[in-house]
A protein has these predicted regions:
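Short beta-strands and strand-coil junctions in structured, solvent-facing domains, enriched
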Residues: 50-51, 78-80, 98, 146-150
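An acidic-aromatic
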Residues: 61-110, 175-176
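Extracytoplasmic
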Residues: 37-39, 57-59, 65-67, 77, ...
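Short, solvent-exposed helix-to-loop capping segments enriched in aromatics
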Residues: 108-122
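Gly/Pro-enriched, hydrophobic low-complexity segments
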Residues: 100, 123-206
Length: 206
């Protein structure tokens, strides 16, 4: 094995700069991502397009740790925090000082977050390879249970790093989440996925 080939394989093992051709299919790449990437963080831009064509753009940050722990922080245009602590999923709106929670199993079922933070995606989704587009390897994920609002998801990888999510929902909306400089197996503080409602907040728990 040449020095350059050895160096490339070392990078693949470290999940820094991997080569997409190391995977037979895009679904293999997704399954490898689930198996080997135990945590991650990134900033993101989310664009939601309504059936009539009107778009809403928001920005924020995202962190996760398997299984079922994650934090979405929306910063613009409206602040909102969504935290999954492994048991519950909390949604907090600081402008209204309102917090609500649901059991993680109910909140994550068939959602985009489940595709990223779950350990067994084949149990929840039917996976199918899609043509490469825009330099990304794409997988179509269709929920096996016809529940919730998500009809289908597409996840795109660039060099084994999570790059984009495309979401089609039952309201006819299309959402695109673009992850910027995704960091695999990031070391995250222990309190990243802890949420305590602020004093005086209106709290509703299910």
């Amino acid at each position: 094995m040449t020095v350059s080939r050895l160096a490339r394989n070392t990078l693949i093992a470290a999940f820094a700069l991997s080569c997409a051709s190391a995977f037979a299919t895009a679904t293999d790449e997704l399954r490898d991502f689930v198996r080997t990437v135990k945590s991650g963080k990134s900033t993101f831009t989310q664009t939601v397009t309504a059936p009539a064509g009107k778009q809403k753009v928001s920005n924020g940050s995202f962190e996760f740790s398997r299984p079922n722990r994650f934090r979405f922080v929306y910063e613009k245009p409206y602040a909102q925090t969504v935290v999954g602590d492994g048991t519950k999923v909390w949604i907090y709106d600081p402008d209204l000082n309102q917090a609500s929670s649901r059991k993680v199993g109910d909140a994550l079922a068939n959602t985009p977050a489940a595709l990223i933070v779950s350990n067994d995606i084949d149990k929840v989704f039917t996976l199918a390879d899609q043509p490469s587009k825009d330099g990304l390897d794409w997988v179509l994920a269709t929920p096996k249970q016809a529940e919730g609002t998500v009809r289908s998801l597409k996840v795109g990888f660039r060099n084994h790093a999570l790059a984009q999510l495309e979401i089609d929902d039952s309201f006819g909306q299309k959402s695109l989440i673009v992850f910027n400089a995704f960091e695999s197996n990031a070391k995250l503080p222990a309190d990243t996925f802890v949420f305590v409602p602020p004093k005086g907040a209106d709290v509703a728990e299910q």
